[in-house]
């Protein structure tokens, strides 16, 4: 059986942290410590040095790739004798629960906005495309939330298709982590951005992963560049438990929170419940649906202790 390391060696160029940081090539740091504080997720300790070493080289790479795509688009438009199209460059960010996808997405959005070639960068999370809570309960999917079948994939594909085709105003549903549900009558409007960052658990899936219909379009069909944020599962489980403890005294303390009943748990009780949620929901979803898509990504960001990036793998 082919090992993970041999597959990655065949498909990717591997960079140690120091090697990758040297590819920054004098790109200026445009974020302050306060900016970074506003971008951090729960239980993340990301520093400006992490931005400098990892994210600035990545923003430079993406800028070069987007510019090349824009130039190619102009050539095609000239060949066809048509006006320049407004199709955005779409970047997807995938990975496990608690790995830090959202923080990675927010930092990249902030950095990419500072490049003059693509100042308009929108960010959409796939959480909003989860079926409403009532539908999940009716379908018996509440304990499968986050699994592929818990998403309204038809709505998500229609959204990403409309954005990709250059429609002027496309609405995406908004998700509340307080109510654990879609927010009724509220939407995020995406209006012809230069770049759209799409962040979610299952954005790398293809027809190979669907036992139902391998012929229907998938989100990955519309993505130009994909990133997978990776870490070993014991670290992910620990980060999830730590985040759960922070939510207990934070978001869960809100009386409107779906998980308000967790706010009075002791540390031991909270750790036990978080571990059980991981073992029965998040862990199996990672093993069955998320991790198997990792080697489809154009770039893998490998995290170690304290959420620090240790390696970067880039498709050959």
Swiss-Prot record:
Its EC number is 2.7.1.33. This is Pantothenate kinase. It comes from the Bacteria. GO terms for biological process: coenzyme A biosynthetic process. Coiled coil: none annotated. It is found in: Cytoplasm. Pathway: Cofactor biosynthesis; coenzyme A biosynthesis; CoA from (R)-pantothenate: step 1/5. Its main location: cytoplasm. Keywords: ATP-binding, Coenzyme A biosynthesis, Cytoplasm, Kinase, Nucleotide-binding, Transferase. One of its GO terms (molecular function) is pantothenate kinase activity. ATP binds at residues 95-102. It comes from Shewanella baltica (strain OS195). One of its GO terms (cellular component) is cytoplasm. It catalyses: (R)-pantothenate + ATP = (R)-4'-phosphopantothenate + ADP + H(+). Pfam families: PRK. Belongs to the prokaryotic pantothenate kinase family. The gene is coaA.
């Amino acid at each position: 059986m082919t090992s993970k390391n041999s597959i990655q060696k065949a498909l990717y160029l591997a960079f140690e942290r120091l090697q990758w940081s040297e590819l920054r090539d004098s790109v200026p740091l445009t974020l302050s410590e306060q900016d970074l504080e506003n971008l951090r997720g729960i239980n993340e300790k990301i520093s400006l040095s992490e931005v400098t070493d990892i994210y600035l080289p990545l923003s430079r790479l993406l800028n070069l790739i987007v510019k090349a795509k824009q130039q190619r688009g102009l050539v095609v438009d000239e060949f066809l004798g048509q006006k320049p199209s407004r199709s955005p460059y779409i970047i997807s960010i995938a990975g496990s629960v608690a790995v830090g996808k959202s923080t990675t997405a927010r930092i990249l959005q902030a950095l990419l906005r500072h490049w003059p070639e693509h100042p308009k960068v929108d960010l959409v999370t796939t959480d909003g495309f989860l079926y409403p809570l009532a539908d999940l309960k009716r379908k018996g999917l509440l304990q499968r939330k986050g699994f592929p079948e818990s998403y309204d994939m038809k709505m998500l594909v229609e959204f990403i298709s409309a954005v990709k085709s250059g429609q002027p105003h496309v609405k995406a549903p908004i998700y509340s982590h307080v109510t654990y549900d879609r927010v009724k009558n509220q939407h995020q409007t995406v209006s012809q951005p230069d770049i759209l960052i799409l962040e979610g658990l299952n954005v790398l899936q293809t027809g190979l992963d669907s036992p139902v219909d391998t012929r229907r379009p998938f989100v990955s069909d519309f993505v130009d560049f994909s990133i997978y944020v990776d870490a070993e599962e014991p670290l992910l489980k620990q980060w999830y438990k730590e985040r759960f403890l922070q939510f207990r005294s934070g978001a869960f303390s809100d009386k409107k929170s779906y998980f308000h009943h967790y706010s009075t748990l002791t540390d031991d009780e909270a750790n036990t419940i978080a571990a059980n949620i991981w073992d029965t929901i998040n862990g199996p979803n990672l093993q069955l649906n998320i991790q198997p898509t990792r080697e489809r990504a154009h770039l893998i960001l490998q995290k170690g202790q304290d959420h620090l990036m240790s390696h970067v793998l880039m498709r050959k």
